[in-house]
Amino acid sequence: MFERDTSYPTAVASNDDEGVDAAIEWCLKQMKTGDTFTVWTSLKSNLKNCTSLERLVQRYDDVVHITGRGGEIPRAPGPVLMVWPDIDEIGQLVRFARQIRALCIITWNADGIRPWVTAMKPEVLGDGSDWEKLSTDLDPVVIEALRSLTLTINHNNTISAGYEKDQVVSVLLALKEAHVSMDADAMQGWVLAHGWSGKNPERLARYVQDINDGKRPRAQRALRADYVDNLRKKATPVETNIDESEG
């Protein structure tokens, strides 16, 4: 319910001259008439560490620089180039997906965004050796549970309290009690690729970590006894027998 659109093109670039140049070119190709090219860094001073990007921002009026620390958001529609973000910072920015026509990430810590890359399957620019190994595959039952939650919760609300928390925590506890394996990082990457944003992907991962550690966050919703069994049925491909007849 009210999930963000994540159908825009995505790319991930290596943190070297080849990757940065390819990222700039990729973003420029995504621009339409009237668009603004947004360059994001966590701190304002970070831009000075990449000469080609600093020069790009200074030279063109339709290229703007925003910072995560300042809470800035894309001011106009167009491609966004995030420079050295972590997965939580990606989650914060994509709250404003309506302004994002395309999203490219320049890598700093590949492991930190590997779950997002695994789930989003972006175009790889520059040196792609960081992405020869991706995150652990999620249990199909977990994917079905996340799909259901994605359609159920209001993504404008936090999952730290109220109805949304009850929904999320109840499902996670049910999965744990049914001995379904849950990978916090991979689940965070999956929901981020499927419209969750802000701090909710991060909070989901924290709930999973706590539950895997034996904690039981409070939740007021009781699920049906066959909830996980129904998820398993949905996750199991249906085999169709086709009778072949001669003549």
Where are these regions (language model features)?
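Short, flexible loop motifs at catalytic/binding sites
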Residues: 1-247
